[in-house]
Amino acid sequence: MIYDVIVIGAGPAGGMTARILSKKGYSVLIIDKKKKVGCPIQCGEVISEFGLMNSKLKPRKEWIKRKHKGIKIFVPDDNFFFSFTKSYSINREKFDQWLIKEAVDYGGRLLLKTNASGIRKKKIWYVKTNRGVFKSDILVGADGPEANVAVWLNLLRKKEFVGAIQYKFKSIDFPEKEFLCMFLNAKFKNGYAWIFPRGDEFNVGVGGIGNIKKWLDDFCKSKGFDLNKKISVNAGIIPKNYILKNFVKQSALIVGDAAGLTNPIFKGGIYAALFSGKLAGETICKAFEFNDFSLLKEYADKLRNSPFCNPILKKASEIFYSFKNEELNFTGYVYSQNNWKKVSYFEIFLKFLSKPKFFLKLRDLWTVKNGIELSEKTI
């Protein structure tokens, strides 16, 4: 059998792509090397309300854990400021499974424990796996940070990532229940620590480049959390700087983490996965409708023009994560216990006047402010 589309990867990006295509009646094969969709969990399990709404998905009780008012961002001296980006903590395992079930219910086929080991293109795509060779007209690489499909297509020029590790606690004594909490410190190179309240449980984690396991253990101890009471551990990698020659080659498309679309400031990737998966699915439908696969390049064009590929994000991230603790504390002083959006440029300027040694960082803080604003539409 020759499928219309083979999707490699059953995460949010692959699930969304497959859901759209199978709903339109196209034959879709989804393959994933995992034994179970959504396992193991490799993220903080958060998506913004905007991201979910813009993906045309309604919150469902089966995978929503808690709604949050926003993000409370702590600097090393314990000062903090807010980003009032409403968001949801989700059960990522159930969310991924729901998306894939939707695709299968519409007619898609799912094969788990199926590891793609290579691809070949003649008139159609041949995907080599441990369960045989599968064929399709169009191929979608939704294989996460490993990005094997992009590598096989010779599209991936650069691949840098950060590590992340997270403990789940059934219940911890932590006063903040309404906000996601993000803890900045220069020792978390290219990352941060987090505490995400989820109703009857909490996710506590650290991401960055370095000894993240030690950082997380030390962080938990500093907050008084009993490590013996953690109920699960998950870890993974998060794209930091993936540079692709293109997001499309011939009749193959790269989506989600495999395309390096993760937000470089907050490290969130679920909305980026859904956005790119939705865009890929819609573009593929159009290509089939007009019997013109050259239209697939529209996916790359639209993705490049989306907020996810805006160079401000990368620039702001590089500046943000180059700050020393003194500069992070000054950032906390500038926005002190306020919604960062409501602090005017004049107020920021006055803060700089009060501490003139930071004047050389004025432009940097402006860039970070712009990056955070853009991030609120990409997480």
Predicted features by range, described:
Residues 1-11:
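Beta1/beta-strand and adjacent pyrophosphate-binding region of the FAD-binding site
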Residues 6, 22-41:
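Glycine-rich FAD pyrophosphate-binding loop
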Residues 14-15:
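N-terminal Rossmann-fold NAD(P) dinucleotide-binding loop
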Residues 37-72:
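N-terminal FAD cofactor-binding segment of flavoenzymes
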Residues 82-102, 208-215:
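Short beta-strand to alpha-helix junction loop
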Residues 102-229, 260:
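Predominantly flavin-linked oxidoreductase catalytic cores and closely associated redox partners
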Residues 116-118, 133, 210-284, 298:
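FAD/FMN-dependent oxidoreductases across multiple families
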Residues 285-379:
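C-terminal helical "tail/cap" subdomain of flavin- and related membrane-associated enzymes
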